[in-house]
Amino acid sequence: HGNRKKIIKKIENAGIDIKCWGRGWPAGRINSDEMVRIFCQAKINLGLTNSSGTAFLKPFIRIFFQKNYDGKVRAQDPKRWLDNFKSFLSRKRKQLKGRNFEVPGCRGFLLTDSTDELKNYYEDGKEIIIFKDVKDLISKTKYYLEHEKEREQIAQAGYNRTIKEHTYEKRFEEIFKVIGLI
């Protein structure tokens, strides 16, 4: 996951105890029940959805090169470069992830990086906390570890917003309205 390990190392170097799960982490993968338990019990759930250091580089390289079926890299046909470049420019690197809804939906406190869309769903500072960079992430982590009552109020507000507006039932209702089924 790109530079996530570097970010985690900086957090550890700042004296913050942190544990990570998933592919490539010492704690390994966990099942969905365990994930929900962690979301509920963790003091801070960290969202690094946009931290991939290769989010720009790999797609850019693919404009000019591609892997063959045997894994060997070869140059793309120059006639395809313009279309590949247009595709590259049109893609969004920052995406709203399910995790942005799952954590608040479990009454978990979410400290996350931002996407253009995220502020349309949650109020920063009231329902979730958004960090700008690693320095801001570390500062906000230390702050909210020390301010339990405020952290719990934000987690509860995030939960209330999620249950009110961001359930699958609400999403399907919106979709059905758009396509004219209701």
Predicted regions and their residues:
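Nucleotide-sugar donor-binding catalytic core of glycosyltransferases
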Residues: H1-D124
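Short, flexible helix/strand-to-coil boundary loops that buttress conserved ligand/catalytic motifs
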Residues: Y122, T141, A155
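A short acidic/histidine/glycine-rich donor-binding loop in glycosyltransferase catalytic cores
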Residues: G125-F131
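C-terminal "capping" alpha-helix adjacent to the active site of nucleotide-linked donor transferases
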Residues: V134-E150
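A charged, aromatic-enriched C-terminal amphipathic alpha-helix characteristic of glycosyltransferases
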Residues: E146-F176
